[in-house]
Structures are given as C-alpha cells and as structure tokens.
Design a protein with these regions (language model features):
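Flexible loop and strand-edge segments within Gram-negative outer membrane beta-barrel domains
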Residues: 131-146, 163-208, 215-227
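Outer-membrane beta-barrel transmembrane domain signature of Gram-negative proteins
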Residues: 184-198, 211-281, 414
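Surface-exposed extracellular loop regions of Gram-negative outer-membrane beta-barrel proteins
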Residues: 114-133, 244-246, 261-292, 426-436, ...
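Exposed, low-structure sequence patches enriched in small/polar residues
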Residues: 91, 96-99, 284, 288-301, ...
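Short loop/turn motifs that connect adjacent beta-strands in outer-membrane beta-barrel proteins
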Residues: 84-92, 116-119, 154-159, 202-209, ...
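N-terminal periplasmic/intermembrane-space "pro-region" immediately following the signal or transit peptide
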Residues: 20-86
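Outer-membrane beta-barrel translocator/receptor signature
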Residues: 75-80, 87-96, 100-147
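Bacterial Sec-dependent N-terminal signal peptides
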Residues: 1-23, 458, 529-539
C-alpha cells in the first residue's frame, strides 16, 4: 500500500507540458456506390517448365603417351564376331496334285526340285489332263500330257542350262452315226519332244563378245517334223557405242518319217540382227536392221526404238518400228487347233485323198506406241497401239474331204490395227484386280480370228489360308466363211484354294458357269460347264 502511495506522489510532482498536433475532423462524401468484385483467376500450369542455358563443352584435349603396362597376367585374345543371315524358310522338294470332276476325267501334277545350291539346280515337272463329254450327236475326248526336265550349272565364268520337254496331245471328236468302229482313225495325236542347251557368259571383259549361245533340236510325231536351231548373242562396245548382234539359224524338216507317203521337205533360214544403243536428248534410242535370208531371197527390215521416261518411275513411253516374224509349223497349228488335217504325220488315217499343210512364214513391219503409267501404289496401267502390213497372215479354213471334216492353213496379206490395254491394281492386302483386252481390225476377212478378246479377274487372298479367284472371259465373233460368223463366247469361272497347312491343300475349279455350248470351230462344240476338285501334298 505504501508503494502505491509513493508512486502516485512522484507522478504528481514531476508533471511537464506535452506538445501535440490538433487534427480536425474531415468530412468525406461518397458520390457513387462502391460495388466490390473479385477478378477471375486463370488456372496455373501444373507442369513447371524450365530451360537450361548451360552448354556442355564436349571438346576433349588429350595427349598420347607411350608406356608399357607391367602385369603378371595374360589377356585372352578375343575371337572375331560372326554375322549370321536370317534363317531361310524351309522349302519342300516335292509336290503331288491329283483331281477329278464333272466332265473332267483326271488332272494331275507331280513336281520335284533339288535342294538349294549355289552351283547346281535340277528338277522335273509332269502334268496330266483329260476330259470327256458328249455334244449332241457326238462324242469328244481330249488329253494333254507334258514332261519338263531341267538342270542349271553355275561356275565362275558361265551358266549352263539344259531342258528336255515332252508334250503329247490327243483330240477326238467322233460322230456317233459314223460307220467306223475304231476311234484311232478319228483321233488326232501330236507327240512333241524338244532338247535345249544354253550357255550364258558371266564375263564382262571387253574382249569377250559372246554373251549367250542356244541350241535346240525338236521332233514331232517320230520325224514328221523336225527343227534344228542355233543362235548366239554378241556384244561389243565401239567408240563407247554399244553394239549388239543377234545371229540365228533354223532348219525345218517335214515329212521325213520312213512311212510317209509324201516327199520330205526342208526349209532353212538365217537371221542377222545388228543393233546399236545410244542416248540423245534424254531419249534412249535403239536402231538396227533385221536381215533375213531363206530360199525365197533376202529381206531387210528396219528396227527403230525410242524410249523416254517422262516421269521417273511413273510414266514411260516406248515407240518405233518393229519387225514381226513367225514360221508356221505343224506344232504351232496343232497348239492352236488340234483338229487340223494331219496327213503325213505318222498316225492312223482313213482314205487316200490326203494333202500336206502349206507351211509358210508370217512376217511384217509395224509402227507401234506403248505407254506404261504407274497410277498409284500397287496400281499400273499399260496401253499400246500398233499398225502395219502383215504378209502371209495365217488363218484356218474348214475342209471336208469326205473322210474328215477338219482344218487346213490358209494365208492372206492384210493391214492390221492392234489395240491392247492392261490394268493391274492391288486394292488391299486381300483384294486385287487384273484386266486386259485386245482389239484387232483387218482390211480383209480372216477366218477363226476374233476381233475382240477380254479378261478380268479379282483374286482374293485371306491370309494365304483361303484364295478365291472369280474371272470373266470374252471371245468375240469369228468369221468361218465370207458371210457367216461363229457366235461370241462369254465364260464365268471360279477357283477356290484352301491351304490347310504348308503341306496339305485342297483345290476346286468351276469353269463355264453359264454352261455355254457354242461352237469353238465350225461343227466343233465346246465342253460346257465343267469342274474339277483335287488335293495337293508337299514333302
């Protein structure tokens, strides 16, 4: 209590004046109403960004010092690394196919190939086909058997190739009302054998001119027709100008079999085709001459070819003058029409009124222009036009000599216009489209030659497991005499292939789904609808 009284007393005794500012009241008038608001805030980026301005100096400074390391151990030498190629898929050496079906007697294929080798390959291929059908009032049988043997040997300087081919075809179209009981007298048979050897040079030395040589000898129906062929291709560069020389010799011998009633005939011909290639104005030129010699005289034809790639790998144009030549033989006629008159070809024949086929050479020169255009990925279009004079243009004529109603060859000189188109497109990994068409126009009537031929197909591939290919074929009208024509033919076909595995697969082919039964040749009707089913096995 005493302390409190003392403290108050001291404060009263030591009072002093304190100076202070006298602040008067200020009047504030608000003329507008204040509306409080909060501004919108933008969202901040949750991911921080930064940039490093520090640069790493990658330069290095070093010096080389020579000294030996003293160690009490020895290092093991490393072996060189070995690079292995990808494993090659296994190949099967052999394949067997057999099938049969409606109006198809049998169809078979046997194939065998050697194992992979760098210097030796060989193989064999056999095919068999036969059918049987009964047109109204007739009976028809056909068969075709082929054998192909091949071998290829490769050494340091050359490639040697040898082939042996055998082709036997029979064709029977028998009138049921015929009084002849034995079919052999009405059956056409053509057995053809051909042996070929070729040598191809791998040397590119300037002093090596011969690039390849080919020799073959053939026989039809036991020396009823023989051909001996020898050809060579020589190349040489003269003053930086590539020169190519093709030499070809052919000897055709007919009716030389011992039982022939006709005198043997022989026709020899020799070809020389020198050509030079050069480039000018961005165009690739190939010029030359075709020199032909035979007993009828010497014929010379020009060869001019110009090739220009207007757009690299896209648009190619090719045009010029070309020579066409083909020797008509009994073999070529039989391939075109197996129902030709076959007198003197070593087979059973009725009657004594036979004749030899007139075998001539068809030749000519024509102007041509070809274009190839890549329209897009996996899409290509090709078109060509050609016009020229054809000497000895061959066409077949029906001749009924009392014993046989068959065909012989005839000739006419014509002016020919030929247009052709080809289109290929891979639409997807599953579907493709292929189409082609040929149109011909002649200034004279020719027999059994269509003006228009077309084909379109659409292969479907389902992962290589199932393959389907529908196709449509059209064959235009053909004159068989001066005023009459054979009707055009329209065929729809369907093929199916199911691959159960790489070893086993099944096949179904349906031909002529519209069951067209029109005449292929005058008085020779086509087979109509037919089909074949088969299986194949690889091992």
């Amino acid at each position: 209590m005493k302390n409190k009284v003392f403290l108050v007393s001291m404060c009263l005794l030591f009072v002093s004046n304190v100076k202070a500012q006298d602040i008067k009241a200020t009047e504030v008038r608000v003329t507008e109403q204040f509306v409080p608001s909060v501004p919108e805030a933008s969202k901040l980026n949750e991911q921080a960004t930064f940039s490093d301005t520090i640069k790493v100096d990658k330069s290095q400074k070093y010096t080389v010092s020579e000294h030996s390391l003293k160690a009490d151990y020895k290092t093991r030498p490393l072996k060189a690394a070995k690079v292995k190629t990808e494993t090659i898929s296994k190949l099967y050496n052999s394949k067997v196919f057999f099938g049969t079906g409606y109006r198809i007697g049998s169809k078979a294929t046997i194939m065998h190939n050697s194992n992979r080798s760098k210097d030796l390959n060989y193989g064999v291929l056999l095919n068999h086909f036969s059918n049987k059908y009964k047109p109204e009032g007739f009976q028809a049988k056909n068969s075709k058997n082929t054998l192909h043997l091949y071998g290829k040997k490769i050494n340091a300087k050359h490639i040697f190739i040898a082939n042996l081919d055998y082709d036997r075809r029979t064709a029977l179209y028998w009138d049921k009302s015929s009084t002849f009981e034995e079919e052999q007298f009405l059956n056409n048979r053509f057995a053809y054998t051909k042996f070929t050897v070729s040598a191809i040079s791998k040397e590119n030395a300037s002093n090596k001119m011969i690039r390849n040589v080919t020799f073959f000898a053939s026989d039809l129906n036991e020396m009823s027709e023989n051909q001996i062929h020898l050809s060579a291709d020589l190349q040489k560069e003269i003053n930086e100008l590539p020169i190519d020389l093709e030499i070809e010799f052919n000897d055709y011998i007919n009716y030389n079999n011992k039982d022939s009633k006709y005198q043997a005939t022989e026709f020899k011909e020799l070809h020389f085709v020198p050509k030079a290639s050069f480039e000018k104005f961005g165009i690739r030129f190939e010029t030359g001459l075709n020199l032909h010699y035979d007993p009828n005289g010497i014929a010379i034809s020009p060869i001019i070819k110009a090739t220009k790639e207007l757009v690299k790998d896209i648009l190619l144009v090719d045009g010029g003058i070309r020579h066409i030549e083909k020797r008509n033989t009994l073999k070529s006629l039989a391939d075109e029409n197996p129902f030709i008159h076959s007198y003197g070809s070593n087979q059973s024949i009725l009657g004594e009124h036979g004749f030899m086929q007139a075998l001539e050479t068809t030749s000519g020169d024509e102007l041509y222009l070809l274009m190839r255009n890549v329209l897009g990925k996996d899409e290509v279009f090709e078109g060509a036009v050609a016009y020229g004079m054809i000497d000895n243009f061959h066409n077949l004529q029906r001749v009924n000599n009392g014993d046989y109603n068959r065909f012989k060859i005839g000739y006419v000189d014509v002016k020919q216009l030929h247009l052709s188109v080809k289109y290929e497109r891979r639409v997807s990994n599953i579907l493709s489209v292929n189409a082609y068409a040929d149109y011909y126009s002649w200034d004279k009537k020719v027999y059994y030659k269509p003006n228009f031929v077309a084909n379109i197909s659409a292969p479907i591939n389902l992962r290589d497991k199932i393959k389907v290919e529908p196709s449509i074929n059209y064959l235009g009208e053909r004159y068989y005499n001066e005023i009459s024509q054979l009707e055009s033919q329209f065929h729809a076909n369907l093929s199916l292939q199911y691959n159960y595995s790489k070893i086993l697969s099944a096949f179904l082919q349906l031909n002529n789904l519209t069951n067209s039964k029109k005449e292929l040749w005058r008085n020779y009707q086509e087979i109509g609808f037919n089909g074949v089913f088969g299986v194949s096995y690889s091992f």
